[in-house]
Amino acid sequence: MLRSLALRTFANILGLSSRSGSTAAMSRNAVASRPHLYTTPIFYVNAAPHLGHVYSALLADVQHRYSAMCGIESKLSTGTDEHGMKVQQAASALGLDPQTFCSTVSLQFRTIFDALDISYTDFVRTTEPRHIEAVSRFWMTLEEQGYIYKGTYEGWYCTSDEAFLSEGQTAEHTDFEGNKIRVSLESGHQVHWVSEENYMFRLSSLRPALLNWLQTEPVHPAPFLKLVHHWLEEELPDLSVSRQRSRLSWGIPVPSDSSHVIYVWLDALVNYLTAAGYPNPQLAPWGPSTHLLGKDILRFHAIYWPAFLIAAGLPPPQKLLVHSHWTSEGTKMSKSLKNVVDPSDCIRRYTTDGLRYYLLRHGAPERDCDFTHRTARMLLNSELADALGGLLNRCTAPAINPMQHFPKFQYENFPVASRDQVHDLLGALQELPVEVDQWIKKFQVHKALECIDACVRRSNAFFQSQAPWKLQRGVEKEAALRDSVIYLTLEALRLYATLLHPAVPGLATVVLDRLGVPHKMRTLKKNTFLAATRGEICYFQAQTLGPDKGLLFPRLEKSEAF
């Protein structure tokens, strides 16, 4: 009976019920009118921020900033996950009470995200009263819907992952001391057998609804969607969603039974509802949502979270954007190997935008990526210092552009022999916003940045071949050609900086300031690029450039990057 109820609930959530078409349409319109919610995972406070946390936040930030630049109202939520056994143990090891420990580490996350210019609109802490209220209300809803019951859980539990595991998700392993232990197949962390009376969630009844949800292809990139389908090929066991307070004291109490605390992952996942204003219905409790997450927590987001939402009568997430991990110099990062990359140190070495650009340009969500200081230095010097910075310097230098303005453009000024090159460049520039849009929406930010870099290099080649420094200002035809070359290069730079803004907002702002672009025109919505090349009125012709503040991105010397 619960299975059929779950399927009916899921159909109604998506507006598929034939007997309530108008109501469903109104509901869909109401949901669609709400701001789109982008989220990072909330990060566990048992340890300091690392490169993986930063990468999740950057990918979410790009999606959020790009939506805003396109005129779409959106929010970005991040935060810290502060309950559970690992936190309790970490605080105890330092002789601190859990709340003090959580506040200290949570501040570290907020500080590094501020340093990286993450444009979050909400920072949720799971120890906040508003979140505790949301979790308690959500639990009661699941209970009222008949999805929670009391039973005995017997099986494997991984404290490091805060995860209950089936026999098939574990394997026997020999540790460094030669002892036989059992570990999680996914994480490699040790598991222990537990047998305790807990509250259980009827996950088994929701498998058909989850399979229906997967038909909408919500998980990206495709290999991760395939993995979730693989997990759902077998029956799902019911899930333990509480721990006895005698075993774990640091958590949110079960509303109707204070001898139990709510399972840390149920607690943590509800943060997305907390950020949306749940349980206050006047705060648009749950609208369109996109979750950014690492592949190590995919199961929790692609099975448990949509199941919880469907059971509570709420729509599952629209998109799960999943990324892989970072290694260091070809090796998994480990404190014992002393190869952990410190984000704060990277900001000092490469600047905020340098680190942002390297991670977004070098990282690819569908595969693990390797961080090396050598590749970071080479990439940043090549693409930011030389290509983009060099192009800006060339067309704004007083020797080339003595009037320090956007000159006039006329296609006819170009010699017939070079018009094919001009035509090709214009075609590439006109196509670039379309390509960038497609790649960002496909969660392939590195591909979007690759397209921009290719166009920047094409512009440099165009500028070099036209050699405006050889053209004499005193000769009318040469002066007109010089002006057209400079205009086209400046307009190209305006386009590049606008498209780069979601990835490197600080650097893009420097370029747009130098070009004298008003803030209202730093958007993709109702913005016209290259108007003069189409014979249209161009706002920027004869506009004065902004002040010169020096090199856009000074080259990194070897000593600075190692």
Curated annotation (Swiss-Prot):
FT transit peptide: 1-10
Name of protein: Methionine--tRNA ligase, mitochondrial
GO biological process, one term: methionyl-tRNA aminoacylation
Name of the gene: mars2
Renumbered ranges of motif 'HIGH' region: 43-53
Record has ATP-binding as a keyword: yes
Top-level taxonomic group: Eukaryota
Native organism: Xenopus laevis
InterPro entries, alphabetized: Anticodon_Met, Met-tRNA_synth, Met-tRNA_synth_2, Methionyl/Leucyl_tRNA_Synth, MetRS_core, Rossmann-like_a/b/a_fold, tRNAsynth_Ia_anticodon-bd
A GO term for molecular function: ATP binding
Motif 'KMSKS' region, residue numbers: 332-336
Catalytic activity entry: tRNA(Met) + L-methionine + ATP = L-methionyl-tRNA(Met) + AMP + diphosphate
Record-stated family: Belongs to the class-I aminoacyl-tRNA synthetase family.
This protein's UniProt keywords: Aminoacyl-tRNA synthetase, ATP-binding, Ligase, Mitochondrion, Nucleotide-binding, Protein biosynthesis, Transit peptide
SUPFAM superfamilies the record matches: Anticodon-binding domain of a subclass of class I aminoacyl-tRNA synthetases, Nucleotidylyl transferase
Binding site for ATP: 335
Mitochondrion found in the keyword field: yes
GO CC terms of this entry: mitochondrial matrix; mitochondrion
EC number: 6.1.1.10
Lineage, broadest ranks: Eukaryota, Metazoa, Chordata, Craniata, Vertebrata
Cell location: Mitochondrion matrix
